[in-house]
Amino acid sequence: MPARKRFGQHWLRSEAILDRIVAAAELRPSDRVLEIGPGRGALTQRLLAAVDGLVAVELDRDLIGQLQQRFGQAENFCLLEGDILQLDWTAAIADRPRFANPSKVVANIPYNITGPILQSLLGTIAQPRRPAFERLVLLVQQEVADRLCATPGQRAYGALSVRVQYLASCERVCAVPPKSFSPPPKVQSTVICLKPRPWPQVCNNPGRLEKLLNQGFSAKRKMLRNNLKSLYSSEQIEAAFAAHQIAPEARAETLSIDQWIGLCTDLGDPTDSAINPTA
């Protein structure tokens, strides 16, 4: 069956890359795994051979029949039809102990919805997903992998880097060239491994931190203090910067997660009375 462009389908055919993905998941026989977008089942076959329960969510109705015919007799296989962003898959398997509460996610996800899928799997700073997955092994566009795994000071480091790394550690597993797919995509790809933190870094007001990140990264070319002046007075900003060893000329992409948390704590909630209109 040919890949469908409207679903962002590119079949991963490299045996070596498939093996790397499975190895990165560090599967145990007792594991229950969620696979998003099983496609034609190349990765599915490997996962079924390694774990006690596999829940696969597929949107393409034509593929559903093929997958059911190929794997439907396997007792450790549960196939759900629907959009992973809209389907309440947790409710669909809640009364099936063999599949309920998967601890790991393995997926070759459509690149055009990577952000929403990450949010559905990790949650947000203000509302982390609970219970958290133990490990997520995802095949994503290289540009996205660079942003997710970037460290302070790197060009790719931004609000997405902070939001994801607040919730999980991120590391690259391997690069995946276009020739590894059929049809080949026009972009480079990377396998990444996310390990959600059992309890994210302590922040006394996660909602405020979300707002602070939005404002801080609103204009990356500007100094951070200028981006924050619409929320806080110059005196508040200078005091918080000094307390967390942040240079006056620092830009948002140079701050560590701990420094962002420190700013969030020290600056408090922005109020009209705190704004210095002449700053």
UniProtKB/Swiss-Prot annotation:
Its EC number is 2.1.1.182. GO terms for cellular component: cytosol. S-adenosyl-L-methionine binds at residues 10, 12, 37, 58, 83, 108. The keyword Magnesium does not apply. Pfam families: RrnaAD. CDD domains: AdoMet_MTases. GO terms for molecular function: 16S rRNA (adenine(1518)-N(6)/adenine(1519)-N(6))-dimethyltransferase activity; RNA binding. It catalyses: adenosine(1518)/adenosine(1519) in 16S rRNA + 4 S-adenosyl-L-methionine = N(6)-dimethyladenosine(1518)/N(6)-dimethyladenosine(1519) in 16S rRNA + 4 S-adenosyl-L-homocysteine + 4 H(+). Disulfide bonds: none annotated. The keyword Cytoplasm applies. It is found in: Cytoplasm. Keywords: Cytoplasm, Methyltransferase, RNA-binding, rRNA processing, S-adenosyl-L-methionine, Transferase. Gene3D superfamilies: Ribosomal RNA adenine dimethylase-like, domain 2, Vaccinia Virus protein VP39. Belongs to the class I-like SAM-binding methyltransferase superfamily. rRNA adenine N(6)-methyltransferase family. RsmA subfamily. Specifically dimethylates two adjacent adenosines (A1518 and A1519) in the loop of a conserved hairpin near the 3'-end of 16S rRNA in the 30S particle. May play a critical role in biogenesis of 30S subunits. NCBIfam families: ksgA. This is Ribosomal RNA small subunit methyltransferase A. The gene is rsmA.
